Amino acid sequence: MSFIDPYQHIIVEHQYSHKFTVVVLRATKVTKGTFGDMLDTPDPYVELFISTTPDSRKRTRHFNNDINPVWNETFEFILDPNQENVLEITLMDANYVMDETLGTATFPVSSMKVGEKKEVPFIFNQVTEMILEMSLEVCSCPDLRFSMALCDQEKTFRRQRKENIKENMKKLLGPKKSEGLYSTRDVPVVAILGSGGGFRAMVGFSGVMKALYESGILDCATYVAGLSGSTWYMSTLYSHPDFPEKGPEEINEELMKNVSHNPLLLLTPQKVKRYVESLWKKKSSGQPVTFTDIFGMLIGETLIQNRMSTTLSSLKEKVSAARCPLPLFTCLHVKPDVSELMFADWVEFSPYEIGMAKYGTFMTPDLFGSKFFMGTVVKKYEENPLHFLMGVWGSAFSILFNRVLGVSGSQNKGSTMEEELENITAKHIVSNDSSDSDDEAQGPKGTENEDAEREYQNDNQASWVHRMLMALVSDSALFNTREGRAGKEHNFMLGLNLNTSYPLSPLRDFSPQDSFDDDELDAAVADPDEFERIYEPLDVKSKKIHVVDSGLTFNLPYPLILRPQRGVDLIISFDFSARPSDTSPPFKELLLAEKWAKMNKLPFPKIDPYVFDREGLKECYVFKPKNPDVEKDCPTIIHFVLANINFRKYKAPGVLRETKEEKEIADFDIFDDPESPFSTFNFQYPNQAFKRLHDLMYFNTLNNIDVIKDAIVESIEYRRQNPSRCSVSLSNVEARKFFNKEFLSKPTAESI
């Protein structure tokens, strides 16, 4: 039976750009004028400039003492055909002190027809003739992928992974409980989620992953999604050369050793100088640099110090042949002067793609950070290393950099990051200054001479390095401000048309039985204005976008997993978020995720916060759709919270602690400990603290393996009873307007 992916046939509207190619061929009789020619023979070069496009200025090399230069150099401009695009041509003479303009000319690109190619002469000073060859064509193959569907690589992964999971589930559940697994259509999609929470989340998630690996649950999962601190563990695990052949146990031993050191040891003058100088190369190439870059280097040096050149793209090798779950990471795009709780676009990262589902725009990971215009790369840079992305994914800590390093004057050492961030909005994080202009380090006119250019760059570098060093290691105003510490990247959606918005669940006939009523949607979980502006579009005119830690809106990466294209049946989430005390209700982040899902018309089981009053604090809670016959697309959620309950009595599930030492090692609080060993701001974990938190979550996970297995069995049966779970009947789809005409001619369609 062949399956059709209906999301593949949804039209994500975008306007095609034009590629304008200019070949600077040659010039004859270049002159500086009668008197100027008597003093010096011209050293000509040509500058091309179109103000309406990024990467707008191009230039040829120069020739010494040549009045009839032949360049034969080709340049490309990506243009918006709706703009009045004018090419400015400037003939220049290179000098040591100040370059001299010999003449200028203009050419209206609108005078060219698409598909046309011609040579055009330009006359300067009534003597010099320059010949340019110009051509104009449509960019029919943009570098962005415009689609609501998953990319082909992920679809291939899912097919392979289902084959593997089918056998793994039979082994996990035994022949009786897995008898419903007749084909891959019966295989449920299981996703594992890890929250933010700094090193507390990272260490806790390391224990979780060890338990899931050893129990066989990880072999039955399709996705592992992380946010902030959990992404740091995922990065450590997936970048390790021995994973997945080697399990988390040995890798966690390495991690424990790495986080036992004080992070201030990474801020020796020699190391900081090396960090900053390496970033100068990035800045001088035209890429934005913020404190997030430096924080990413510190995180990388701590966790993946021998793998600093690893990239996100390189992790594709780990999921080849679907040997392990596909890792998904996330951050937020935010706007200046708008609280991230009011507006934030979720950006998803996988080894295959980076993009925003809200706009149906995706790119390969090696293009993230490159300069785009209308969906086409106009300037490509090297792929950002994984440690830079780790800094972006956990950038809340670069915002409060001084607290992380322990040099803050604050006496409230027990306060959580969440408490400190309550009064921070995007306007404190995002610098809304003139840096939106292109950042290429450009010398003044006259630096064409290589020695002068080198001297100019060295002076600039020395000044910049000095400022950054002073900001890091002194109590300067720059060090104590939060402004400008968000990650900053070139806007990959610059120049696109966002007149049409796309719901995150475009094919779903959202019925009133499983939706929120108005009172529920109006009820605030954390803030009266939460999610108030989530339907607003991104600013496609801004040259830069700011990306921050997703935990600044809510601390669980549900938006990645709730995309209906992924068809997740069972979500196992682990919440390491800070709470006021160990006995506080643990559902704040889950309730925010629920509200976000309902506002985006995505199925989500009803979260009953009063279960805490009825049943008290537990290691995990199960939330199911109340009416499975109606809520056919609604996943089941097993929600683990950070709690030390049974671990105090048992050293393994069913095995009591007996000795005094065994009891003492497990007798600890997480949020009520006055020493705050598990504070969100703690970036040094002595071996005992690491083992306590790691072993606690290892135990909690293993102690509830039967809960997970039972949910998997129910998901298999649910799949069998609802074979059309991922199918779409066009007659029931409200979003028919999004389909192309060819697809609408089909009577029905089913997805994979």
From Swiss-Prot:
Activated by cytosolic calcium, which is necessary for binding to membrane lipids. Activated by phosphorylation in response to mitogenic stimuli. The keyword Lipid metabolism applies. Ca(2+) 1 binds at residues 40-41, 43, 65. In brain tissue, expressed in low levels in olfactory mitral and granule cells, in hippocampal pyramidal cells and in dentate and cerebellar granule cells. One of its GO terms (cellular component) is zymogen granule. It is an enzyme of class 3 (hydrolase). Pfam families: C2, PLA2_B. Residues 427-457 are annotated as: Disordered. It comes from the Eukaryota. Phosphorylated at both Ser-505 and Ser-727 in response to mitogenic stimuli. Residues 6-122 form the C2 domain. Ca(2+) 2 binds at residues 40, 43, 93-95. GO terms for biological process: arachidonate metabolic process; arachidonate secretion; cellular response to antibiotic; cellular response to homocysteine; decidualization; establishment of localization in cell; glycerol metabolic process; glycerophospholipid catabolic process. The keyword Iron does not apply. It is found in: Cytoplasm; Golgi apparatus membrane; Nucleus envelope. CDD domains: C2_cPLA2, cPLA2_Grp-IVA. Residues 140-740 form the PLA2c domain. It catalyses: a 1,2-diacyl-sn-glycero-3-phosphocholine + H2O = a 1-acyl-sn-glycero-3-phosphocholine + a fatty acid + H(+); a 1-O-alkyl-2-acyl-sn-glycero-3-phosphocholine + H2O = a 1-O-alkyl-sn-glycero-3-phosphocholine + a fatty acid + H(+); a 1-acyl-sn-glycero-3-phosphocholine + H2O = sn-glycerol 3-phosphocholine + a fatty acid + H(+); 1-hexadecanoyl-2-(5Z,8Z,11Z,14Z-eicosatetraenoyl)-sn-glycero-3-phosphocholine + H2O = 1-hexadecanoyl-sn-glycero-3-phosphocholine + (5Z,8Z,11Z,14Z)-eicosatetraenoate + H(+). Interacts with KAT5. This is Cytosolic phospholipase A2. It comes from Rattus norvegicus (Rat). The gene is Pla2g4a.
